[in-house]
Design a protein with these regions (language model features):
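An extended acidic
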Residues: 17-38, 77, 83-154, 230-277, ...
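An acidic-aromatic substrate-binding cleft motif
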Residues: 27, 31-36, 40-49, 329-398
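Short Pro-Gly-centered flexible turn/kink motifs
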Residues: 79-82, 188, 235, 299-317, ...
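Short, well-ordered beta-strand segments enriched in hydrophobic/aromatic residues
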Residues: 80, 174-182, 304, 805-812
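Non-catalytic C-terminal accessory modules of carbohydrate-active enzymes
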Residues: 93, 98-162, 169, 670-673, ...
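Polysaccharide-binding surfaces and accessory modules of carbohydrate-active proteins
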Residues: 110, 165-274, 295, 327-351
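Aromatic-rich carbohydrate-recognition surfaces in CAZymes
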Residues: 119-121, 397-404, 408-510, 533-538, ...
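Extended glycan-interaction surfaces of carbohydrate-active proteins
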Residues: 143, 352-396, 421-443, 497-530, ...
Length: 867
């Protein structure tokens, strides 16, 4: 018995049982606009500190066509809606349930001010909580948190503390908590006026939607208005606001009567301390109306006393509005509950005392990706759109098809139900019987009217493989999924048809034929004259074996064999594309592209597919570092890169002997597209990690690339740029560009940032560098980080490394026996553990193998220790 007790005491503590939060306290990467800190919920938050009305740094060159170029915002959201909380104090709500629309677009010129703020009337004074309209001498604070936006105002003996948030979960609603405190020694009477604008706007059409006449439900304290049925949306959502907590002493819906001569800063109705309840007139489509939702709360506060009011705002089906209001009226402390769920969900990473900022970055990245999810009624699914100017700006479309599929990759390990929804959403964009998938989607599941690309199928295939292998949810692939245009087939059938279509694009030189749009790099076909892409063949050389592993797990041996053979053939074909320094980009007719210049796109995929031998890998990494990262480049070019590596060398580099399609993103590029792309650098980070132990210092190079592609790195390098502090565009300028701190693709100067590539690829690349890889039989844990100690815990998988031990856990969506492979720690005697008990193991090729019996949704722990 004593011996057994000793064994039990020696068992490593289960990693899944650790509940402590890792340290994310660091100011590194704050930029010039404010400071990062850890809030009372234990989550990263950013305090915006500059006065945008006075400080010239607030003016953003990338918003030169915006109504207010000092706009700075942070993303709010849950699994259903997205919202932007602005430095000025208002919040805009975005909905994709039906048409893609801003529900309450800010337009000062037309008297629409978005919402999520209010006015306190007391002692004959009006106190606005908008930052621009704050009273003289008032003390204020603005915080952008992971899950909320907070504003505080102290003036005239009162303190107002506001939180706007989309409660964690799947309801299409924003909540606004307002706590008002009497800071004086005598009783005070006051009135709070809650304000929400109603100004639905479709970016794709660049026009407002029509509205009916607002209605008031006196029993439930709900204001609502129907949107006009027009175009393809014959069943539009109803916009609503409701008082959930606190007294109600009047309501208003007519903005002209509410603001009157006092305007935004001091509305006439607030000055009168009265709301008249008259209904705003209906609004014709294409016209901006004067509809608003205002609610008055009369208050009496004892000395030092405080009251918390709560309001809801959203857009939903008419029958759902009452349900949503009832649910959140009954909720106790919904803000704290929502934040607790975010705090439990975000990844917990530890990478050493000097990298608390990196742990913060991963939490913020995970929050950004998940809060960027929306629900689309036409697909009965959630999707994680690309965001940014593509979704919310002038394009107003869900483009491109491949984007949600890459954004779901890290969610496979953090929110698998959401990832599965994205997979099903994407599969239904496939035309009946297979064929070319459209470039993207418009609202109501309509195809985007843009030329297609030749890589759409492969992204569907890869994301499906990642999901199936990681979650073991093989039943999803039997689920019936509609085709675009009619008909239904199992998800597995969709994947087989995608494979057939992808292979129908084979070109004469072993690559895949392009259209004018090209492949990943949009318009590469037209700009480069490229008729055949070897980027796609390199990608498929990696993807097909992964899908083959899923096919084997499903028992589809015939398809698995077909995929494996094709993957081997592609690897062989890619080896012939070696130029002696790197791999080619493609063909223009019979002419090879990329013999005298390195294109960044295909290199990582050749590495991931296992194409280069050891010597070629060393040569390739040397070329990447020299030409794309700028290490050892001529000093006059401006390198090395302070943020991500470039996709192109510098046109002025004397060692470049081929140029095509420049000047590209930001200028100065030798080849199209150029610039530093967060997705492509995610591939590069991951690929460099795979060469750890093959190429000297490859693991260190991978960590270096990961860190340079963080928001913190951009804010540290270019502290005066807001674009890159809380979010960023899909691309930034290269290190040799005239303005290396600028970001964006120069197609829209009214919207910037909030694109999902950077957070999604930061989080996914981190899981790969941590060594987490699902396999046909289970999982492989082979750390690539050059750190003696680190840990990374996500909801569905985790790993912790220290000298002499590796601990981990998996929490699959479906149970069964898994084979776990763990890199053998250095030491003389290996012991394997499962669930705290010693188990039999084997060692092969440096990997310790154990069997793990799992239950759906439950954590199964393992460990490998040495003496």
């Amino acid at each position: 018995m004593a011996l057994l007790a000793g064994v039990a005491r020696a068992a490593p503590a289960p990693l899944s049982g650790e509940r402590g939060r890792t340290d994310v306290a660091s100011r590194y990467g704050s930029g010039a606009f404010g400071r990062w800190f850890v809030d009372g919920f234990g989550l990263p938050a950013y305090r915006y500190r500059i006065d945008e009305g006075r400080d010239p740094r607030a003016r953003r060159s990338e918003l030169e066509d915006a109504a207010d170029p000092t706009d700075a915002w942070s993303q709010l959201g849950n699994d259903h809606v997205v919202a932007n909380a602005y430095n000025h104090g208002y919040t805009q709500l975005w909905s994709q349930d039906r048409v893609y629309e801003w529900v309450n677009r800010y337009s000062a010129a037309e008297g629409q001010y978005a919402g999520g703020f209010g006015y306190l009337r007391a002692g004959g004074r009006t106190l606005s909580t908008l930052y621009a309209d704050r009273p003289p001498g008032a003390r204020s604070k603005r915080v952008f948190g992971a899950g909320y936006a907070r504003r505080t105002l102290a003036a005239a003996g009162f303190a107002v503390d506001e939180h706007v948030y989309a409660p964690f979960g799947d309801d299409p609603v924003l909540l606004h908590d307002v706590t008002i405190r009497n800071r004086t020694r005598k009783p005070r009477s006051a009135s709070w006026f809650e304000y929400w604008g109603v100004n639905p706007w479709e970016p794709a059409k660049a026009r407002p939607r029509g509205l009916g006449t607002p209605s008031w439900d006196p029993r439930r304290h709900i204001l609502s208005v129907r949107q006009a049925a027009e175009g393809p949306d014959r069943r539009p959502l109803r916009i609503f606001a409701a008082a959930l907590r606190g007294p109600v002493g009047g309501h208003a819906t007519d903005a002209a009567r509410f603001f009157g001569a006092g305007g935004r800063a001091a509305p006439a109705a607030v000055a009168a301390d009265r709301l008249d309840g008259r209904r705003a007139a209906a609004v014709a489509p294409g016209q901006v109306g004067r509809t608003l939702f205002a609610l008055r709360a009369p208050l009496r506060l004892a000395p030092g006393a405080a009251v918390t009011l709560r309001y809801a705002y959203g857009a939903a089906r008419p029958r759902a509005v009452r349900r949503i209001v009832t649910r959140w009226r009954a909720a106790r402390r919904p803000l704290a509950g929502s934040q607790r769920r975010w705090a439990r969900w975000v990844p917990q990473g530890s990478f050493g005392a000097g990298r608390h900022w990196l742990a913060r970055e991963l939490q913020w990245a995970a929050y950004t990706v998940r809060s960027g999810a929306t629900y689309e009624e036409c697909a009965h699914s959630h999707v994680i759109s690309q965001g940014g100017y593509y979704q919310y700006g002038g394009f107003g479309s869900q483009i491109a098809f491949r984007d949600p599929l890459q954004h779901m990759l890290p969610m496979v390990y953090a929110a698998p139900a959401l990832a599965g929804d994205v997979l099903a959403y994407s599969a239904r964009e496939q035309p009946a019987g297979g064929g070319q998938i459209a470039y993207g989607a418009q609202s109501l599941c309509r195809p985007a009217e843009l030329p297609p690309s030749n890589d759409m199928d492969l992204w569907l295939l890869w994301s499906a493989a990642e999901y199936g292998l990681a979650t073991r949810d093989l039943a999803l692939f039997d689920r019936p999924v509609p085709f675009r245009g009619g008909g239904t087939a199992s998800l597995w059938r969709h994947l087989k048809l995608a494979y057939v279509h992808q292979e129908s694009l084979r070109g004469p030189h072993g690559g895949y034929r392009t259209t004018s749009t090209g492949d990943w790099s949009d318009f590469s076909g037209a700009v480069l004259g490229m008729t055949e892409s070897t980027l796609v063949s390199a990608q498929l050389a990696y993807v097909y074996p992964r899908l083959a592993a899923l096919a084997r797990a499903r028992g589809d041996r015939a398809f698995a064999g077909r995929l494996s053979r094709r993957g081997a053939a592609l690897r062989a074909a890619q080896r012939s594309e070696w130029t002696g320094r790197w791999y080619t980009r493609g063909y223009a007719g019979d002419r090879r592209l990329g013999t005298g210049v390195i294109f960044g796109e295909p290199q990582p995929w050749n590495i991931l597919a296992g194409v280069p031998g050891r010597g070629q890998a060393r040569t390739l990494v040397s070329g990447i570092r020299r030409f794309l990262t700028g290490v050892g480049a001529p000093a006059a070019l401006g390198g090395p890169a302070r943020i991500g590596s470039s996709m192109s060398p510098a046109a002025a580099d004397p060692a470049v002997t081929e140029r095509a399609g420049g000047p590209g993103i930001g200028g100065g590029n030798a080849v199209f597209v150029g610039g530093a792309w967060y997705a492509v650098n995610g591939w590069l980070t991951w690929a460099l990690g795979e060469l750890a132990g093959v190429v000297p210092r490859a693991g260190a190079y991978a960590l270096d690339e990961l860190e340079r592609n963080t928001l913190a790195a951009h804010a540290a390098a270019f502290p005066g740029r807001w674009n890159g502090v809380l979010s960023v565009d899909d691309a930034c300028n290269a290190w040799f560009a005239p303005d290396p701190g600028d970001c964006g693709i120069d197609l829209d100067h009214t919207y910037a940032g909030q694109i999902m590539h950077q957070p999604a690829w930061t989080l996914y690349a981190a899981t790969r560098l941590a060594g987490i890889v699902p396999t046909a039989r289970g999982y492989r844990f082979r750390p690539r980080l050059p750190l003696r100690r680190f840990s990374l815990r996500l909801p569905r998988v985790g790993i912790a490394v220290r000298p002499g031990s590796v601990r981990g856990y998996v929490r699959p969506s479906a149970g069964g026996r898994l084979e776990i492979e763990v890199a053998r720690p250095r030491g003389s005697r290996v012991t394997a553990w499962v669930g705290g008990r010693r188990v039999a193991s084997s060692v092969r090729a440096g990997l310790v193998r154990v069997r793990l019996d799992t239950r759906a949704g439950h954590a199964s722990d393992f460990a490998v220790t040495v003496r």
